[in-house]
């Protein structure tokens, strides 16, 4: 009778051949090492009586393939997921009377095709394990090997899963497995989205939990140090300087305690509100910029009294952290917001949610820390007689090798390293002084020179060098002073050239706008408190990126938490979102140009006064 075709003859035969050699090695203890290939090829056969005779005498002919599968002994035919009777009887004959193998599992009529196959595979595994123990010095002979109950019905061998799958045939199990894989593909995608959503909620929970901890830390400063100092008084040498130590941290604490923390907790019920929460309070977060601007002065005062007066207060209050460790918390927190928002955005996008507003929120929280860092650098600038806050927003700062003009307007023979600050109204050249406080971590700067934007000129790519450019200053008598700047990176130089060119272009636009003041006022009203021009952001109508000069629509409010400052045409009434304590909606129907309304928040009366913080308090 012709044996049935095998599903995958090449790969299956190779695996079966190796498996047969392993079984043959188990049945013949005298054979060690890998079997030798038969020179006669796979067609040579050996009778069963010859095999038994060789086992008894211990002799074998070298030209006979000892491990080759034999048609009458243990050849395996796979068809419809079952083993043939000849294969089962061959296994029974292979075990022999002295091997101790029971003939029941390998009887010509097995209990079931899969059960018989599993027992056959288990016998192979058991033989190999016993052989390993014998080689390691333990006693035991091959004749005494028995098939113990190591495999129960329904249990599979993990090491032999691939082989079991190949031997089950193409009938009832192969095709359903493929169909199951195809049917599980969308299910796995849904599970991945569900898992990503769970991770995003975990990040949101971490944001809320760390916000509570942050509020407690600020409370130790306001309700601990500041309250105690107000009750007991301060030393004479510290009187009048205690406000420099704490800055506006009380305003930050009250806003987080009475409003922001409660809003974050509501986001646990509605995660989509998280992005709007940060976008809405972009202007309120300007408190951190003011705090960071005062931070270098606070460090200077704290360095004089930190080891004496404030240490006594810490021990009196029983606080674990020192005051300078608590005062750095707002700086760390404003950086933490952007990291948590980025993680939330990553998982929320994987969950298939709309992340357009989240991307805007991340951009806001990347811009605010940059402004904070700039203000901390400016707080360490000494020797400038003017008021830095009157010079407009800080557009950039970098270190250059500057060749400055000397007496007579001639350039110096060598360049000097300078820290250059670019404002809207002035460019300041300063020299780094090294460590700026205790520990020398932050450098201080001393003022050297400056150029007013009204007298500024630009020469880019000097001598074809992309790292070099020149800034010129027109003197009161018509003379020109020239500063040659060389950056370490061409990208830095080109960014400065572009930024200065935009400033000069804006200056020309301003002169042209003098002929039309109303149009100029409309354009300037698109700038919010952080100095970020309004306009379309990428993927977001009504907002723009920092430094973008595109003019925004006059109908688009910049910040929903504040009244609109835009000039509207006569007769047009637009609904304006007021601060939370005075929010009122107009009865006039909303025009197509109005911005979408933000979710209504029930604000307790204790929170209302925080919404009245004006520009001077910030």
From Swiss-Prot:
Induction: Transcriptionally up-regulated during myogenic differentiation and down-regulated during adipogenic differentiation. Protein levels up-regulated during retinoic acid and dibutyric cAMP-induced outgrowth of neurites. GO terms for molecular function: guanyl-nucleotide exchange factor activity. Residues 584-593 have a biased composition (Polar residues). Keywords: Cell membrane, Cytoplasm, Guanine-nucleotide releasing factor, Membrane. It holds the Pfam family RhoGEF. Disulfide bonds: none annotated. Highly expressed in excitable tissues, such as brain, heart and muscle. Elevated expression in hippocampus and cerebellum. Residues 387-505 form the PH domain. Residues 506-532 are annotated as: Sufficient to bind activated GNAQ. Residues 317-338 are annotated as: Important for binding to Rho GTPases. It is found in: Cytoplasm, Myofibril, Sarcomere; Cell membrane; Cytoplasm, Myofibril. Residues 26-63, 169-193, 521-556, 584-604 are annotated as: Disordered. InterPro entries: DBL_dom_sf (IPR035899), DH_dom (IPR000219), PH-like_dom_sf (IPR011993), PH_domain (IPR001849), RhoGEF_Guanine_NuclExch_SF (IPR051336), SOS1_NGEF_PH (IPR055251). CDD domains: PH2_Kalirin_Trio_p63RhoGEF (cd13241), RhoGEF (cd00160). Residues 199-375 form the DH domain. It comes from the Eukaryota. One of its GO terms (cellular component) is myofibril. May play a role in actin cytoskeleton reorganization in different tissues since its activation induces formation of actin stress fibers. It works as a guanine nucleotide exchange factor for Rho family of small GTPases. Links specifically G alpha q/11-coupled receptors to RHOA activation. May be an important regulator of processes involved in axon and dendrite formation. In neurons seems to be an exchange factor primarily for RAC1. Involved in skeletal myogenesis. The guanine nucleotide exchange activity is autoinhibited by the PH domain. Interacts with activated GNAQ and GNA11. Interacts (via the DH domain) with POPDC1 (via the C-terminus cytoplasmic tail). Interacts with RHOA, CDC42 and RAC1. This is Rho guanine nucleotide exchange factor 25. It comes from Mus musculus. The lineage of its organism: Eukaryota, Metazoa, Chordata, Craniata, Vertebrata.
């Amino acid at each position: 009778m012709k044996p049935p075709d095998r599903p995958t003859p090449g790969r299956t035969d190779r695996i079966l051949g190796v498996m047969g050699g392993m079984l043959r090695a188990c049945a013949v203890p005298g054979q060690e090492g890998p079997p030798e290939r038969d020179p006669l090829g796979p067609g040579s056969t050996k009778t069963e009586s010859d095999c038994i005779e060789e086992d008894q005498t211990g002799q074998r002919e070298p030209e006979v393939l000892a491990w080759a599968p034999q048609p009458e002994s243990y050849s395996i035919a796979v068809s419809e997921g079952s083993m043939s009777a000849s294969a089962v009887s061959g296994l029974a004959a292979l075990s022999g009377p002295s091997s101790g193998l029971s003939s029941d599992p390998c009887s010509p009529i097995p209990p079931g095709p899969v059960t018989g196959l599993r027992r056959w595979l288990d016998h192979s595994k058991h033989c190999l394990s016993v052989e390993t123990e014998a080689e390691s010095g333990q006693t035991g002979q091959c004749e005494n090997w028995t098939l113990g109950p190591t495999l129960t019905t329904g249990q599979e061998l993990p090491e032999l899963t691939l082989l079991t799958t190949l031997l089950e045939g193409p009938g009832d199990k192969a095709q359903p497995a493929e169909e199951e894989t195809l049917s599980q593909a969308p299910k796995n995608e849904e599970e991945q989205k569900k898992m990503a959503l769970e991770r995003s909620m975990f990040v949101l929970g971490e944001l809320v939990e760390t916000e509570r901890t942050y509020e407690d830390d600020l409370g130790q400063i306001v309700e601990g140090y500041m309250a105690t100092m107000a009750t007991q008084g301060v030393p004479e040498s510290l009187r009048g300087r205690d406000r420099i130590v704490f800055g506006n941290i009380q305003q930050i604490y009250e806003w987080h305690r009475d409003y922001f923390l409660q809003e974050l907790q509501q986001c646990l019920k509605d995660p989509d509100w998280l992005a709007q929460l940060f976008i809405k309070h972009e202007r309120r977060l300007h408190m951190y910029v003011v705090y960071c601007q005062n931070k270098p002065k606070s460090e200077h005062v704290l360095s004089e009294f930190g080891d004496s007066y404030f240490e006594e207060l810490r021990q009196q209050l029983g606080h674990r952290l020192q005051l300078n460790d608590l005062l750095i918390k707002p700086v760390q927190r404003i950086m933490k917001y952007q990291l948590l928002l980025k993680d939330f955005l990553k998982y929320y996008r994987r969950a298939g949610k709309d992340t357009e507003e989240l991307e805007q929120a991340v951009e806001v929280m990347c811009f605010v820390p940059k402004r904070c860092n700039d203000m901390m650098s400016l707080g360490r600038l000494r020797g400038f007689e003017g008021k830095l806050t009157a010079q407009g927003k800080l557009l950039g700062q970098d270190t250059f090798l500057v060749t400055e003009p000397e007496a007579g307007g001639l350039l110096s023979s060598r360049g000097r390293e300078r820290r250059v600050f670019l404002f809207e109204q002035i460019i300041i050249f300063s020299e780094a002084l090294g460590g700026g406080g205790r520990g020398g971590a932050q450098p201080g700067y001393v003022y050297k020179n400056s150029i007013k934007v009204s007298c500024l000129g630009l020469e880019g790519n000097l001598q074809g060098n992309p790292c070099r450019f020149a800034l010129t200053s027109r003197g009161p008598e018509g003379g020109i002073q020239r500063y040659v700047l060389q950056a370490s990176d061409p990208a830095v130089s080109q960014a400065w050239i572009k930024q200065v060119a935009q400033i000069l272009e804006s200056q020309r636009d301003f002169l042209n706008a003098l002929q039309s003041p109303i149009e100029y006022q409309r354009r300037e009203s698109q700038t919010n408190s952080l100095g970020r021009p309004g306009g379309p952001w990428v993927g977001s109508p009504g907002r723009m990126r920092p430094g973008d000069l595109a003019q925004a629509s006059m109908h688009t409010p910049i910040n929903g938490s504040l009244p609109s400052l835009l000039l509207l045409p006569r007769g047009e009434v637009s609904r304006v979102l007021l601060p939370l304590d005075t929010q009122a909606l107009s009865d006039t129907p909303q025009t197509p140009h109005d911005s979408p309304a933000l979710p209504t928040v029930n604000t307790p009366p204790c929170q209302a006064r925080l919404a009245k913080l004006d520009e001077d308090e910030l």
